[in-house]
Design a protein with these regions (language model features):
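Fe(II)/2-oxoglutarate oxygenase catalytic core
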Residues: 1-125, 134, 138, 144, ...
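Trp-centered recognition loops
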Residues: 124-128, 150-151
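Basic nucleic-acid-binding interfaces
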Residues: 131
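Short coil/turn motifs at secondary-structure junctions
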Residues: 136, 164, 181-185
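Short, solvent-exposed aromatic-acidic interface loops
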Residues: 145-148, 181-182
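Conserved metal-binding segment of the jelly-roll/cupin
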Residues: 147-162
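A general secondary-structure boundary signal
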Residues: 156, 177-179
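Ligand-binding loop in jelly-roll beta-barrel domains
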Residues: 161-176
């Protein structure tokens, strides 16, 4: 099925590179966190994040979404983690300033990340890429403006469009997120975010916040 809001597989610039690195990216992470599924602790993505007009609360349970950082959008490379994640650091450094942000992204079991947009990319000059590393079987997925995407291949999207995640399985999900400039990905410019720019998007019931209208 053709998607309007998502680039998938070979539509993603550098897809072959990302696929080739998947085993090493996962191996580094598991070596650093052998208890990944049963006890390893990571930094929680802030629970309150988004401006008026979008969900103020980001997910259904505090710390449902966690990150193991490689490059911060404001503070740059998080070099203290280089020994743990050598493949990810090599990848990010190869892109230089064209990479705005990168990190391992963990979604907890039975978690919903409500619809949101990326506060770090308001000018929409970057595109967010998902490199799937461990995806549980079962009821799990991702949507952008109602278009459903599975983590069966690399994909990218404009994170200024409303998007959400659900993981109705007993396991954690792991992907590497990397934000690259649209220019290096040979993509045309995208409009910058502005208040109300997503007001036209219909509700997506599967991840709808029951406390938000």
């Amino acid at each position: 099925m053709e998607l309007k809001n998502v680039y998938r597989g070979d539509e993603v610039k550098f897809a072959a590179l990302f696929r080739a690195l998947q085993p090493a990216l996962l191996a580094d992470f598991i070596a650093a966190h052998p208890d990944f599924q049963v006890g390893a602790k990571f930094f929680g993505v802030p629970y309150y994040q988004n401006p008026n007009g979008e969900n103020a609360v980001l997910y259904n349970e505090i710390n449902a979404w966690k990150i193991a950082g490689i490059k911060h959008d404001k503070y740059g490379l998080m070099t203290s983690f280089r020994p743990q994640y050598p493949t990810a650091f090599a990848l990010v450094e190869a892109f230089g300033d064209a990479c705005q942000m990168a990190g391992y992204s963990i979604v907890e079991p039975n978690a919903i990340i409500y619809r949101h947009t990326g506060v770090e990319n308001r000018d929409a000059k970057s595109i967010r890429i998902h490199i799937p590393l461990y995806v549980p079987e079962g009821d799990i997925g991702f949507e952008v403006e109602g278009e459903i995407v599975l983590w069966d291949d690399v994909f990218s999207f404009n994170n200024q469009k409303l998007h959400s995640v659900w993981n109705n399985t007993p396991d954690r999900r792991l992907v590497l997120l990397i934000d690259l400039s649209r220019e290096i990905c040979e993509l045309p410019p995208a409009p910058a975010h502005f208040p109300g720019c997503n007001a036209h998007v219909p509700v997506f019931e599967k991840t709808r916040d029951p406390n938000y209208s």
